[in-house]
């Protein structure tokens, strides 16, 4: 019985760790020539888990890059400082329009979860956020690599997101919406790769979608069977 209890505890910890994700927090509205704050977190927001940057969990996914994509399509890498439970950076908008913030991390060691019937895989994290510096917001920018989440302006309190995989919209893609206190909702994309929903509470929402790319390869001398893609988007609490 004691052995079974230990196995259950280990599996619970494994499941919690595996469900972690990176996400970006920033104000959705910016101002010309005024510094914009950007934070990078790792954990599980709905469970109240925010990993410490000096902990092993965050260290294992800390080789990420964050890019600012300007309204004119040019981009620049964001410099980040390590804080206690997040990475912090700033950029200053100099153009009117919508800015896309993109995090990408495919520099993560291969993981062997064959014991748990998941296989041997390499993780590819991407996170997105949008900052409007205009009275007329436009859609955010997508990437041609992995999973992308694009926010489409609606002009009302409804949110529309479109999910892309390697630049193409994907239908029937499962998307999870999380808030604190273990509340979550699952939606599936339509034929155009879109989901729509409202934000009924003034709180932070994190959105996550994942996909397996069943192509084997090698990373840092370790073979893997597939790539596990994970993309996130965050709507911060309104001030």
Range-by-range predicted roles:
Residues 4-13:
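Sec-dependent N-terminal signal peptides
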Residues 95-109, 204-213:
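Short, aromatic- and glycine-rich surface loops/edge beta-strands on solvent-exposed regions
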Residues 64-74, 174-186:
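Short amphipathic beta-strand segments in non-cytosolic proteins
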Residues 13-19:
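Sec/Tat signal peptide C-region and signal peptidase I cleavage site
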Residues 20-39, 115-159, 168, 181, ...:
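Beta-strand-rich domain onsets/edges
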